[in-house]
């Protein structure tokens, strides 16, 4: 009745409205449970240690006792942390922390109520002094910084198309006892794995071992890499490392203002290379370790999955047929475009749960797809049209009309272009990695070994725009609303943009060395989000000031893509955690 009176208060006198308001106040004061307003803060606390009375940048992690999902926040400059109620359901949670060099003593749990704010109190951390225990807390970048050796030696380890950290942490390398001779054999074995579709827990053996003599790892001498690794691991009977273990600084300032939620997918072990978000906020991902796509509804935490077609031929005896999906792109109708294996395009309709496939005039298709934004109807992809002639691969770009299903004429990309000339590598090739389109719908892609952005008009006039930094290895990125394509320079530790109206490239230096940026994605405010391979940090660049904010994830992560959820009510970024089979949501809270 009271709600009805209030709703129709425009026909009541002011005096009677005042009486209604007074009645409402009395009801609230009586403490009726059904009318209690839940506190916006579900849990708060502080962090300190024997070394620091106030600890900023400690990642505090909660995990429900009945769920694998992780929810994490980071302590601020006052050592305080808080979890908002809209991200914590009532129930019991395990409490853990991430702060290299420190640990939380004993098991700790907390019960979150339905309405009242809970104060966890002080989390008191103790310093880790045992190097063997500290080693398990280091990121791969921490290991690179700790390893002795010259810049050239560390470049051997990190600056490769595929490096050790792409499938597992460098802790595994550092703890190994392999000699240089044995490590060459390890590299030989790992060369038989399909790197994008594999992790340490999900391995696909797709090629036969190459001869040890003259073995290279993506253009580098395998023997040089092995000899260096044998100087930093536990070979020769060592029980501890003969160098100090170094850790990166903890997050600070704006880097503490995020809530991170980690969703392990149900099918494990899996590999998640790419994802995208539809107009409703659902997260679609390709399972790169198996022939499945999946969907997460973040509102309910519910997962769904569907099997995918695979058009690769059967392999020769003793080898595995590559399975798994890489790129995912969702168009404005929420149709899901999927980079299935083989030489075809494939789309999935969420409404009918059916697949449609389209032929492409290629014998091999690049496992990435160009984005299709609202108002765009061209899906760009590349593929090899005939058997390569040595290093000439006959890679062509094709525009696919997602509305009509028509495939445009192929654009020859590199056959008449000079070969890359990085003096530190052999057997270099011209090829496209990540493709996109300019505001007019014309093709572009990153050409990593040519250290260029390849561009073409509809008539097939191709030009290479070189990066200002030579041999920078441009990797993946995305075009913003101002017709600038943002991309990472993996070897140069830069993020860059090319003005697609003028071809001018602007570079922004990232720190520290070997931060290894992989994917760059602009958000609606003009900030650029960058995934980093090996640091477990997500970066945010402000191009106007050059300021970079770093957010530490609660888990080891390797994200090959960054997606901004434009349907969310706050800046929200999604990451596919390749090697752990997880989806990570990062929400900026301030």
Locations of the language-model features?
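The canonical Cys-X-X-Cys-His
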Residues: 160-171
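Short, acidic Ser/Thr/Gly-rich low-complexity loop/linker segments typical of extracellular
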Residues: 65-82
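A short, solvent-exposed loop/turn motif at the edges and junctions
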Residues: 68, 90-109
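Structural motif
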Residues: 42-56, 88
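Blade-level signature of beta-propeller repeat domains, shared across WD40, Kelch, NHL, RCC1
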Residues: 552-590
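Extracellular beta-sheet/turn segments enriched in Thr/Pro/Gly and aliphatic residues
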Residues: 35-36, 111-137
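Conserved beta-strand positions in repeat-built beta-propeller and related beta-rich domains
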Residues: 283-289, 331, 336-342, 381-392, ...
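Beta-rich, blade/repeat-based domains predominating
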Residues: 268-278, 312-331, 363-376, 418-439, ...
